[in-house]
């Protein structure tokens, strides 16, 4: 049986994800304590079911500590995947403000109704509840496939989940490619970032024969605030728009990073980005002027 467990921060889209599973033919259960999942899986398997989707979250907080053990037990006889949905605190506060729903851990301000007769939320208490939930769930996030929905519309999230659960496809593969502009821009690049404005190790004679993978060059570039800022901006851009590319049913997304010769700056940035995004799934690195894809 294929079992997908959905957990994560309240308000991050778990209900949307569970609905996608149900539409795809999964037998779905919401808010099921973790310790009950193995018995349910055994029963459903005996009845001929092959797909199970379960959402478990802070509403069953006492049982969450059992989830890692539950996953290990299920994995002995089933195909098990864990999706952890999250979002920024600002995004979550905005969503709760729009829906007027209570956070499971939120504290109401003296229980006094607002002008519309509904309980008045204390935004500070809400943010504290969100951060408390993050802390409680952080052990689960570390071992799950994390999905950040902060900047993701509902339709995009649905498409993303559909892609993740497809039986006949693998995840999108991110390819980070360094190159030198003097040799031309890669024709297969989906996104191109120009880092030629960054400080250039080429002008240090001791660093000139090295590459962006060598320690002295890495130390040089990491000491430059401008380099770190540009790397962070590129990372944020790719991470924000990655769901759109996944929803487009792509197999690969090629992100090209170019400097003058393709030896120092672009190599360093490509390696730095690849190291970050490896937590998201399949990642390749290609240094066009140095070596083939790895």
UniProtKB/Swiss-Prot annotation:
ATP binds at residues 8-15. GTP binds at residues 57-60. Keywords: ATP-binding, GTP-binding, Nucleotide-binding. GO terms for molecular function: ATP binding; GTP binding. Pfam families: PapZ_C, RapZ-like_N. Displays ATPase and GTPase activities. HAMAP family: RapZ_like (MF_00636). Belongs to the RapZ-like family. This is Nucleotide-binding protein Reut_A0350. The lineage of its organism: Bacteria, Pseudomonadati, Pseudomonadota, Betaproteobacteria, Burkholderiales.
């Amino acid at each position: 049986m294929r079992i997908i467990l959905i957990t994560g921060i309240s308000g991050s889209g778990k209900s949307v994800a569970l609905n996608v599973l149900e539409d795809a033919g999964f037998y779905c259960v919401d808010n099921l304590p973790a310790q009950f999942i193995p018995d349910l899986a055994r029963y459903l398997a005996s009845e001929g079911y092959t797909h199970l989707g379960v959402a478990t979250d802070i509403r069953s907080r006492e049982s969450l500590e059992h989830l890692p053990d539950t996953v290990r037990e299920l994995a002995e006889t089933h195909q098990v995947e864990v999706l952890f949905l999250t979002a920024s605190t600002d995004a979550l506060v905005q969503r709760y403000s729009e829906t007027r729903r209570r956070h499971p851990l939120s504290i109401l301000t003296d229980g006094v109704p607002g002008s519309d007769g509904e309980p008045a939320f204390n935004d500070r208490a809400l943010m504290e509840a969100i951060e408390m939930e993050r802390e409680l769930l952080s052990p689960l996030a570390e071992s799950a496939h994390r999905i950040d929905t902060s900047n993701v519309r509902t339709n995009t999230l649905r498409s993303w989940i559909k892609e993740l659960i497809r039986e006949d496809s693998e995840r999108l593969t991110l390819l980070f490619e360094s190159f030198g502009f003097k040799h031309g821009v890669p024709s297969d690049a989906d996104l191109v970032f120009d880092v030629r404005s960054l400080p250039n190790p080429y002008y240090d004679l001791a660093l000139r024969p090295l590459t962006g993978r060598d320690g002295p060059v890495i130390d040089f570039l990491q000491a430059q605030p401008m380099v770190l800022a540009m790397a962070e901006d590129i990372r944020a851009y790719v991470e924000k728009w990655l769901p759109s590319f996944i929803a487009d049913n792509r197999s690969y997304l090629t992100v090209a990073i170019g400097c003058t010769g393709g030896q120092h700056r672009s190599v360093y940035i490509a390696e730095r980005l690849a190291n970050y995004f490896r937590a998201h799934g399949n990642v390749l690195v290609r240094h066009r002027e140095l070596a083939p894809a790895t």
